Amino acid sequence: MAWLALLGLLPLLPAIQPTWQANGYEINSTADSFVTAATPFTLRSARPPECPPCFNCQLPAFKCHQFGKCNKFNGKCDCPPGFGGDDCAEPLCGSLPDGRDRTPRKGSTCQCKDGWSGINCNMCETNDACNAMMPEREGGVCYRHHNGGETVAENYQMCEVTNRKIRDMLKEKKPQVTFSCKKEDKTCNFQFWVDQLESFYCSLDTCKWNMDITENQNLTTYQCDNIKCGCVPDRMLCETTGVSLEPLFGQLTGPAKFTSTSTKGGSNKDGSAFSEPVIDKVISDLFGDKSILLDCYSSECLYKTAVPGYKPPVKVINTPLIAGVIAGCSLFIVGVILLIWYLSRRKAYNQYHALADDSDDEGSKLMADHKPASLQFENISYYINGQQILSGIRGIAKPGQVTAIMGASGAGKTTFLDILARKNKRGVVHGDIYVNGEKFNDSEYKKVVGFVDQEDTMLPTLTVHETILNSALLRLPRDMSDAAKQQRVYEVEKQLGIHHIKDQLIGSEEGKGRGISGGEKKRVSIACELVTSPSILFLDEPTSGLDAFNAFNVIECLVNLAKSYNRTVIFTIHQPRSNIVALFDQLILLGKGKTVFSGPYSSCQSYFDNIGYSCPPGFNIADYLVDLTMHASQSRSTEEPAVNVDSHDNNFRTASSSLRAVKSVASASNASIDNASAVDSAQESLLRPKDKRRSSLKQRQDRQLYTRKRGSGLESPPDPQTDNEDGHVMSLAERAQQWLPLSRQQGQVPPQILQDPDHLPPIASGFVTDLDVLVSYYANSNVANAVRDEISSSVQDALAANGQANSQQASDAVTGQMTGYARVGLIRQFIILSSRTWKNLYRNPMLMLTHYATAILLAVLSGYLFYGLTDDIKGFQNRLGLFFFLLALFGFSTLTSLTVFSSERLLFVRERANGYYSPVTYFTAKVLFDIVPLRLIPPIIMGVIVYPMVGLIPDWPEFSKFILVLVLFNLAAAGICLLIGIVFRDPGVANLIGSLVMLFSLLFAGLLLNHDAIPASALWLQTLSIFHYAFEALIVNEVTFLTLIDHKYGLDIEVPGASILSAFGFNNLALWNDVAGLGVISGVSIIMAYAAMHFLLVEKR
């Protein structure tokens, strides 16, 4: 830096010229000549002598200033920043980011671009000015210092010479220095300027930097081992006819040292100084200063992470908070377990104590204040899929009596009972049903009827008392007090003999225990209907699956109900015991959907005796009649083998009742009737057709039991009151004489007689089976006529009471109105159903506890795997993975919502059909107790554990939005699964559809398929994806305002999270739109689920 020492000598040059010459310095008086002889050949051209030669730095006559490198390809100089021209002698303007596009200075000074300054516009002033030099064109920092500052990459300094005497000597001329260093090359260079004209320049190499930082002072030191300088021709200090420092530059060998001092608060010691042994001696001798003094400003454009002293913010994981959250969630689970244990130990209701008298009065009024209901029906027919199931059934069920509907399997008993109970049938129903001679619409009719299904469907987690009480609370009058309803429940329990088991759980085969027995369950089902004191009670196979003792107890309870409270009880029954049959008041016998008998049970045996189908002694008449309809329904054939049981004994007399004391029919292995053993094999062989093999014992017994006997061949079906009292059985000849007149009776088939098969009467036209004969006999019997007359009389009396004309149109009108009562309101229904649902939930807590335990365990595991997410690209990828995993976990765990209604589908359908409650209250209670414990709490538990462990943004607004998105997503997924579970009845199909829907939604989340890569025609599918809404909302909430660090170009570049999200196809402004989308899908799916339940889960039999 010899130029600094010589700066003060300019005014003294004329005076000290002899001295400099004596000391070896040279002052030129003539211009140097260009030497061209050194070139290997002489270039000759037609260039005129007045034109200068073209610049070519490869020729000795030309050189590169600023010690620029000569480009061997174009003969031009590669200049350092801020200099240009062919020889790097011209300062450039504009700004550093312009690079090769910078323009040479025109005039005495440069017009720099905004944010740039200096003689050659190399000094930055603002951060925005540096952005253009950054790889991503943002994040730039103008690193400026006054008298100091470490060179990070390549810095530039603008200095003012502060030696007082030097400035005084130059007067108005301003000495300045530009100085720059490049750390990678360990080089520096400077230029000396007088009035912004460069005089000379120097280059330093093998440089070292050091910063000494103390509490009050920063000291920056540059030390370069080598130094060389050069002149700009015809400039001050490098004049061709005046002072030239070039000979002095040859003596500068270094080392050179440049120091800058900056103190806290500023002091007179602040500044920069340059020292070099030769220069220091000259300055000391001439100006009395130790070195050249400068006041410098340095600047350097850096990426913000490269600024010295910059430290990326270090995330602090709050370990105590994490431990506290995990402990709190664990304590919550323990609390839930303890609560469940306490509730399961506590009895559902305290032991019953005596209630107030007014409760007894209300219960008594309920039982007594009703109008006896006599049920009449005629011409009941039913068609489904073009097939007739029932045909022309007629009968009466009277109050105070029990009416039994019997028939073989497939006879249509249950179908007929459903029609009487006004159940919703899939087929077409014809006929008339009257109550006390009047017709009623379905809503009025169902107010006073109760129906007990064959299968007992109840919640296994409720006790007997709770099950019956729920029926009472929901179905008894609104103005009836709870105490009176409980009193009514206890009365029914005692009446049915189940009071002693009132606190036992119903139970099930799949549960922890079997619970109560099958007979007890049947009585509980009956109690649920009896508690409402219906005027008409229908029961489908009430003895099904019960042993004989329990079956009798159930029927006896029904008989007591009918007799004691004047109720009408109608039930179907299959093969009852004789002691049960004896309790019947009315009997309806069906065969293949047709009426074989319908009337008083007391007339049944006499009726069948008189038409020739006497129940053998010792047989249960119910079994006999059911078997009779089965055998009679078989096609008739004269070729069937026959057995002669009466040809040998014309004095045989038969009884009119199975209760009379006569010998019983033997078993199939020893079938006989009185004196049948007297028939020898010779007689039997004569009676058997010659081409037929011997009849089996079963066929023989069936022929004995179910073939019409003599004494029944009357001109018309007999009236049970006109039985032949002597019981005389006609002889074979007398029987044979009756075939002709019987065959002439209006299409009736003469009864089949046990006689010689060769003498069987011909089959009458119009009938295929003996069942047709039985049906025809009944239709023309006095019993049927009596029933028909009674129905007609009842209808006419009702019409007369209502003041209507006796006409067919009047009889077809709906005129009746039941004396029903107001049921409880929707709010009360919701409270009762919520209580029932809550009990069912906490008494079967495994699903709920599994959800909670899974949430805690997977939250801790996820927090461990993703612990302390970093703010870089790797951390961004881990965030994507974390959010994707959380959503997949909750999405597929909500498949348990498929079973919310499947396990209670049948229960709901039946309770709805029986008028327990409104569907909306049941749906609301079920959804509420599925959403709160299973869909709301687990994501909150998991969120509060995962969020602090993985180090997501530690701000309450972001945390709240994170939890909100998880909860809404869980609700939306649960709503979709709920809808699927209702629409698809089969659990396997529902699980498959639910899984496919979740996978489809997962595909459009935004991680597996970029938004911008989705075809335009399929883009609308993404609007249906709940995973897309939730995934985008979570990642936008976390990353939008986050700055991620990406290591590129040797720098730690901070990349805005928003730009990365945009590259992945996410919308940075879509957070609340996504939240709204999740909310809409949640609401729409739940509404659609209710609509599906309301319209699809309707009882159709």
Swiss-Prot record:
Membrane topology according to the record: Multi-pass membrane protein
Keyword vocabulary terms for this entry: ATP-binding, Disulfide bond, EGF-like domain, Endoplasmic reticulum, Glycoprotein, Membrane, Nucleotide-binding, Signal, Transmembrane, Transmembrane helix, Transport
Domain ABC transporter, chain residue ranges per copy: 375-617
Membrane spanning stretches: 321-341, 846-866, 881-901, 936-956, 962-982, 989-1009, 1016-1036, 1051-1071, 1078-1098
Domain of life of the source: Eukaryota
GO cellular component terms, semicolon-separated: endoplasmic reticulum membrane
InterPro entries: AAA+_ATPase (IPR003593), ABC2_TM (IPR013525), ABC_transporter-like_ATP-bd (IPR003439), ABC_transporter-like_CS (IPR017871), ABCG_dom (IPR043926), ABCG_transporters (IPR050352), EGF-like_dom (IPR000742), EGF_extracell (IPR013111)
Domain EGF-like: 84-122
Disulfides per UniProt: C93-C110, C112-C121
Residues annotated as glycosylated: N28, N218
Stored Pfam families: ABC2_membrane, ABC2_membrane_7, ABC_tran, EGF_2
Stretch forming the signal peptide: 1-15
Compartments in which it is found: Endoplasmic reticulum membrane
Binding positions (ATP): G407, A408, S409, G410, A411, G412, K413, T414
Molecular functions (GO terms): ABC-type transporter activity; ATP binding; ATP hydrolysis activity
Lumenal domain ranges by topology: 16-320, 867-880, 957-961, 1010-1015, 1072-1077
Region: Disordered, residue numbers: 677-726
Stretches in topological domain Cytoplasmic: 342-845, 902-935, 983-988, 1037-1050, 1099-1101
Protein family membership: Belongs to the ABC transporter superfamily. ABCG family. Eye pigment precursor importer (TC 3.A.1.204) subfamily.
Protein's name in the database: ABC transporter G family member ARB_01379
Organism: Arthroderma benhamiae (strain ATCC MYA-4681 / CBS 112371) (Trichophyton mentagrophytes)
Record lineage: Eukaryota, Fungi, Dikarya, Ascomycota, Pezizomycotina
